[in-house]
Amino acid sequence: MFLEMLNPMQYNVTIMVPETVTVSAMPLLLIMGLLLLIWNCESSSSIPGPGYCLGIGPLISHGRFLWMGIGSACNYYNKMYGEFMRVWISGEETLIISKSSSMFHVMKHSHYISRFGSKRGLQCIGMHENGIIFNNNPSLWRTIRPFFMKALTGPGLVRMVEVCVESIKQHLDRLGEVTDTSGYVDVLTLMRHIMLDTSNMLFLGIPLDESAIVKKIQGYFNAWQALLIKPNIFFKISWLYRKYERSVKDLKDEIAVLVEKKRHKVSTAEKLEDCMDFATDLIFAERRGDLTKENVNQCILEMLIAAPDTMSVTLYFMLLLVAEYPEVEAAILKEIHTVVGDRDIKIEDIQNLKVVENFINESMRYQPVVDLVMRRALEDDVIDGYPVKKGTNIILNIGRMHRLEYFPKPNEFTLENFEKNVPYRYFQPFGFGPRGCAGKYIAMVMMKVVLVTLLRRFQVKTLQKRCIENIPKKNDLSLHPNEDRHLVEIIFSPRNSDKYLQQ
């Protein structure tokens, strides 16, 4: 009787055994599943790079870009994992490439013409599917690019020489406006004013307040750089991005007023040929329905900010190098005397200024301003044996490539690096291919014009032991001097041009 009473309990215990085993095995099975998931994530890509680690890897890599800046983070990861490696930005797989053959492949093919960046960030600065610089709508970009190419080549390039020379001379005559009580010249401000004035005369032709707009351009650039790869959560907290939004609005409102003045000028012109330029072509395209008002305003904004944003800093670095290397300055001046003499530079002189060109190239190689290019793959591909999926982000680390391959003295500033013709696959300061810089030819000519005109009139000096290496820099979207800190002081000493050039 007693044993019979125990039987149900015995049966119940027997039934409970598999349930107990199943429950106790669950944590083990979960751990095994997670390990399998991690293993799959780690082994799914043959491209070197940090591990996925349950999503922690993407968070850390994106955080590093936000903390260090895009350019500095790219150099860090290429140094850590090699010249073709993979990280994540905003959770998206991103390749960082500093290998010339891979870079050549990306620049060459049309399925890499799209850019990448935060959609919210690009919308905030007006570049999302608009303008030319970061327009990631290939169809609209193809519609807009010909307007830039027409303005930046051919007759526009020829006219630029005379316009730029006059602008430089006028600003040098007013050098006191950018010189402090100690005699130091604010070269960055001087160059930004010259670049803006020249761009305005060539592409818009409406009187403007240079000082006010230069400051607004700096605010716009800071917003662009700050917002480009910010995560979406950043834009859910309005007080975090409000100051950037204001900076963008300040410049866009200013440009809108200038464009309206241009529209009025075009509408009331007695002779239309007197006001034909880049802005006029865009306004006519809007009237035909090819572009919107927003397209026109953004294109003009980007045309006006391009030179003050990058070329002014490039020229600032070049003048520091001239001051640091007197033997290079002597070679440049000798060539100026031989080719140009005591007259203003002309378009015919440009191709004969070989030493000046080598100096410009070596300066851009040794101390670049724009040292990376951001692209997105529009279709599946294979680059140097590595599979690349459609939608993959790509950063071309051009500045690092210029220090790794081909050049005999890659870590030194010397014109010897350009004594021989450099194959263009190894030197790409402006990029090439279907999405290469539209302004690369006019930029080279403009830099020659500025250097020749300025160096014939002034000798550039810095304080002893102050040089380009001493400048605090920020390597983010581009490499700029940190203007929040004290920059290297530069003195412009007038010289007897004829006597000096003949030495």
UniProtKB/Swiss-Prot annotation:
Record's signal peptide: none
Lineage, highest ranks first: Eukaryota, Metazoa, Chordata, Craniata, Vertebrata
One GO CC term, this protein: endoplasmic reticulum membrane
Cofactor: heme
Main location: endoplasmic reticulum
PROSITE patterns referenced in this protein's UniProt entry, alphabetically: CYTOCHROME_P450 (PS00086)
The protein's annotated pathway: Steroid hormone biosynthesis
Protein name per UniProt: Aromatase
Binding-site positions, substrate: D309, M374
Localization (cell): Endoplasmic reticulum membrane; Microsome membrane
S-S bridge residues: none
Enzyme Commission no: 1.14.14.14
Transmembrane parts of this sequence: 21-41
Keywords carried by this UniProt record: Endoplasmic reticulum, Heme, Iron, Lipid metabolism, Membrane, Metal-binding, Microsome, Monooxygenase, Oxidoreductase, Transmembrane, Transmembrane helix
InterPro entries given in the database record: Cyt_P450 (IPR001128), Cyt_P450_CS (IPR017972), Cyt_P450_E_grp-I (IPR002401), Cyt_P450_sf (IPR036396), Cytochrome_P450_Monoox (IPR050196)
Annotated heme binding sites: C437
Free-text function comment from the UniProt entry: A cytochrome P450 monooxygenase that catalyzes the conversion of C19 androgens, androst-4-ene-3,17-dione (androstenedione) and testosterone to the C18 estrogens, estrone and estradiol, respectively. Catalyzes three successive oxidations of C19 androgens: two conventional oxidations at C19 yielding 19-hydroxy and 19-oxo/19-aldehyde derivatives, followed by a third oxidative aromatization step that involves C1-beta hydrogen abstraction combined with cleavage of the C10-C19 bond to yield a phenolic A ring and formic acid.
Gene Ontology BP annotations: androgen catabolic process; androgen metabolic process; female genitalia development; female gonad development; mammary gland development; negative regulation of chronic inflammatory response; negative regulation of macrophage chemotaxis; positive regulation of estradiol secretion
GO molecular function, one term: iron ion binding
Catalytic activity field: testosterone + 3 reduced [NADPH--hemoprotein reductase] + 3 O2 = 17beta-estradiol + formate + 3 oxidized [NADPH--hemoprotein reductase] + 4 H2O + 4 H(+); androst-4-ene-3,17-dione + 3 reduced [NADPH--hemoprotein reductase] + 3 O2 = estrone + formate + 3 oxidized [NADPH--hemoprotein reductase] + 4 H2O + 4 H(+); androst-4-ene-3,17-dione + reduced [NADPH--hemoprotein reductase] + O2 = 19-hydroxyandrost-4-ene-3,17-dione + oxidized [NADPH--hemoprotein reductase] + H2O + H(+); 19-hydroxyandrost-4-ene-3,17-dione + reduced [NADPH--hemoprotein reductase] + O2 = 19-oxo-androst-4-ene-3,17-dione + oxidized [NADPH--hemoprotein reductase] + 2 H2O + H(+)
Family the entry assigns: Belongs to the cytochrome P450 family.
Keyword hit for Isomerase: no
Top-level taxon of the source organism: Eukaryota
Topological type in the membrane: Single-pass membrane protein
